[in-house]
Regions:
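Conserved beta-strand elements of the Class I
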Residues: 15, 311-313, 733
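N-terminal glycine-rich phosphate-binding loop for ADP-containing cofactors
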Residues: 3-5, 10, 20, 32, ...
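Conserved CoA-thioester-binding segment of acyl-CoA-metabolizing enzymes
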Residues: 1-54, 91
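Conserved class I S-adenosyl-L-methionine
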Residues: 730-738
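Gly/Ser-rich catalytic serine loop of serine hydrolases
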Residues: 102, 106-112
Length: 749
């Protein structure tokens, strides 16, 4: 049984029904049936005058357990569609002859919130979280939320809460009229009890949300709002249907009446819950939470040490972004620069970052000064004597980084963590001039560091588990999703992303059209096609990165001619307003009619046969090499879990979350198909496409690409091992086939 409700009747005649499924009191069919039983038991009892519904442990309910959605449950419900929403919640609970009040602490989300909306009044704590975030799973609210929320807060606010999946606090819910009264946690249930009795005595209104109309906009206005919202949703997410379905269901209720709306809602949910999109988004939900669970590290029981003061070395784009992320989350930061003017520039960038947060509504103007007071600019290492963590974020120059690490070792206390924000260099090389290898770790932030939610944490074979646990904790406090990876050129995210532009160049040099490639890829769901990405990054950086990868992975790197040809024409990307695209004063990109001329020049440098490709071919030829690289990363143990790469691809590359991340998507296509395509292309176009051993092995078995590293934590490079090829037995636990097969693995590059 997955949870239940508990019924207790007090001497005052109020029955308390407590949803009990800790820790979040998630709903399940069992909980709902138990709630129904408790309500049906309480209603006819003579000693019950009113009912309060609440959740155990001060948490109302986090909503339905989403692991049952997306077809993973297998349990088929035989009940009629709408049974819970209409026959129970509406016809029994909402229509009850005794007042029912919800007492809400903690989360009241999704189905949990919908139960509360059915009640005749809601009392909450000020910090409770109330909302309908079902759309984040490709679902729509299924227990009446689409009908009741607009009737309680008006259409505009309801649409915002549902389509953005953003909850409101109890305090804000009170202002919106969603909550009738706010009470302190320890008085919550008693306040709800007396409210319920007051409703009975007609001293408080007895409201059935479904029948309210006072907050609903007039029909013509409502229709206009829905039309605009529908258009926006179509524009923002052309590959997704569930937002449009949600809007249709709301409209149906407004035009044909809420009961018809309820039925339409239940039918739509039934269809959506089995969709591939829901399956993918549910996977992303759990995968994201899973990134901070590192076998052999976070299961050691090491509590994170308290990090109070952090030093950031370098106030450039990355350093100032990192400092911003830290001070916004209440850390005290020392920002070190080499001279007065660079320091002023760095602090200036932090201010600009904070102001941009004000413009985006993420911070108030008044908070800027207080936040900035946590930033202390310095020119020497003297104030590093009490820092717990240093994050080095200077330019990608190995000698400079080595010198900084040697310097900070002299000034910092013994316990300080030394983190490096490199996206490229081997951390062992960076720490070569120190004796502190066990406290060196990579903290790879993504630009802009104070916005992008991803933090790639890079460990070497010598980084201590305590240091990893500490950085995970800092990451959590600054609201980043960490992905812990091993040490190698490009780490996991850079390596996975590298083939994105490489394949695109290869395709164009073999006959594809630049803009057709970008169009096919954005249609697939990427926000920017590969050529727009190269323009944004800038040709100089793109070439430097490319050289780095070509050096590290020569056997599979493609050396494009196209960028060099464009560079000869003084094009350098978006910053010069001329790259693959032309850019206007506002940075708006438009195709360049001259581009084909340069493409033909690049094509003429080799004697390849030009291809004709469909959009589907383009998508496969761009993404299968990424899948291939992801497989290498998994096989080498650079990533611990396939789902970590899914999150890395979604947060680091903006791969569409509704496709579940790179490996999840690849599995939906099948390893055999992907491998056979790569094999074919490698015959014609060379080793860039050659499938790696891991992919070939999985494809031969028709197996999933999911494999979890069991417990070994470090990635060893063969060239760094004293006795190469001796003893590195990496136990790989195969979860995909569920056979528990252990395979010895030796790797290197
Ligand atoms: C018919 C209905 O309309 C359909 C629905 O109700 S769909 C569900 C709607 N509910 C939601 O979207 C809520 C999703 N959950 C959340 O936003 C957050 O978990 C929360 C705000 C409730 C709590 O946050 P927080 O305290 O930080 O805990 P968090 O780490 O996220 O979750 C704790 C555990 O519960 C799990 N969990 C949370 N919500 C869950 C859910 N709805 N289903 C399944 N598991 C859930 C998490 O995976 C995590 O598991 P773990 O400990 O094994 O890693």
């Amino acid at each position: 049984m997955k949870g239940r409700t508990v019924l207790e009747v007090g001497a005052d005649g109020v029955a308390i029904i407590t949803i009990t499924n800790p820790p979040l009191n998630l709903l399940s069919v069992d909980v709902m049936l138990s709630l129904k039983e408790s309500v049906e038991e309480a209603l006819p009892r003579e000693n019950v005058k009113a009912i309060v519904v609440t959740g155990s442990g001060g948490k109302f309910s986090g909503g339905f357990d989403v692991s049952v959605f997306g077809g993973s449950d297998g349990r088929k419900e035989n009940r009629k569609v709408g049974f819970m929403s209409i026959e129970f919640l509406t016809d029994v609970l909402e229509a009850s002859s005794k007042p029912i009040v919800a007492a809400i602490g903690g989360p009241a989300l999704g189905g949990g919130f919908e139960v509360a909306l059915v009640c005749h009044a809601r009392i909450s704590t000020s910090t409770a979280q109330l909302g309908l975030p079902e759309l984040q799973f490709g679902l729509i609210p299924g227990l009446g939320g689409t009908q009741r929320l607009p009737r309680l807060v008006g259409l505009t606010k309801a649409l915002e809460m549902m389509l953005m999946s953003t909850p409101v606090t109890g305090q804000d819910a009170h202002i919106l009229g969603l909550v009738d009264s706010v009470a302190p946690t320890d008085e919550l249930v008693n306040t709800a009890r007396s409210w319920a009795l007051q409703i009975l005595e007609r001293r408080r209104p007895w409201v059935t949300s479904l029948h309210r109309t006072d907050k609903l906009e007039p029909l013509a206005v409502a229709r206009a709002i829905l039309k605009v919202t529908r258009r926006q949703a179509q524009k923002q997410a052309p590959n997704l249907r569930h937002q449009l379905i949600c809007i249709d269901v709301i409209e149906e209720g407004i035009i044909s009446g809420p009961r018809i709306g309820l039925l339409k809602e239940a039918e739509a949910l039934e269809e959506l819950r089995q969709s591939e999109i829901t399956r993918s988004l549910v996977h992303i939900f759990f995968a994201r939470r899973g990134t901070s669970k590192i076998p052999g590290i976070t299961d050691l029981g090491l509590p994170p040490r308290k990090v109070n003061r952090i030093a950031v070395v370098g106030g450039g784009l990355m350093g100032s972004g990192i400092a911003t992320a830290l001070i916004v989350s209440d850390y005290h930061v020392v920002l070190k620069e080499v001279n007065e003017s660079s320091l002023l520039d760095g602090i200036g960038r932090v201010k600009v970052n904070l102001e941009s947060q004000v413009k985006r509504g993420k911070m108030t103007q008044e908070k800027i000064e207080r936040t900035l007071s946590r930033l202390n600019g310095v020119l020497s290492y003297d104030s590093f004597k009490d820092v717990d963590l240093v994050i080095e974020a200077v330019a990608e120059n190995l000698c400079l980084k080595q010198q900084i690490f040697a310097d900070i070792e002299k000034y910092c206390p013994q316990h300080s963590i030394f983190a490096c924000n490199t996206s490229a260099f081997d951390l062992n090389a960076i720490g070569e001039r120190t004796k502190s290898q066990n406290r060196i770790i990579g903290a790879h932030f993504f630009c802009p560091a104070y916005v992008t939610p991803l933090l790639e944490i890079v460990r070497t074979e010598r980084t201590s588990p305590q240091v990893i646990v500490d950085l995970l904790d800092v990451g959590k406090r600054i609201k980043k999703t960490p992905v812990v990876v091993g040490n190698c050129t490009g780490f996991a995210i850079g390596r996975m992303f590298f083939p994105y532009s490489q394949s695109a160049m290869l395709l164009v040099e073999r006959g594809a059209d630049v803009y057709r490639v970008d169009h096919a890829i954005t249609k697939f769901g990427m926000p920017l096609g590969p050529f727009r990405v190269v323009d944004r990054v800038g040709f100089e950086v793109a070439i430097a990165t490319s050289n780095h990868y070509v050096k590290a992975y020569p056997e599979r790197a493609f050396k494009p001619m196209l960028i060099s040809v464009l560079q000869e024409e003084n094009r350098a990307g978006e910053s010069t307003r001329k790259g693959f695209y032309l850019y206007d004063d506002n940075g708006k990109a438009s195709p360049d009619p001259d581009i084909q001329k340069y493409v033909e020049k690049a094509q003429s440098t080799s004697d390849v046969t030009l291809m004709k490709l469909s959009d589907g071919d383009i998508v496969e030829m761009i993404f299968f090499p990424i899948v291939n690289e992801a497989c290498r990363i998994l096989a080498e143990g650079v990533a611990v879990k396939a789902s970590d790469l899914d999150i890395a691809s979604v947060l680091g590359m903006e791969f569409p979350a509704y496709r579940g991340g790179i490996i999840f998507w690849a599995n939906s296509i099948g390893s055999t198909y992907i491998c056979s395509k790569l094999k074919d292309w490698s015959m014609t176009h060379g080793d860039f496409f050659k499938p790696c051993a891991y992919l070939v092995e999985r494809a031969a078995k028709g197996a999933s690409l999911v494999r979890h590293l069991n417990c070994f934590c470090s990635v060893l490079h063969v060239e760094q091992m004293e006795k190469p090829l001796l003893v590195f037995d990496m136990l790989l636990l195969e979860l995909g086939g569920g056979t528990g097969l252990y395979t010895p693995y030796v790797f290197g590059h």
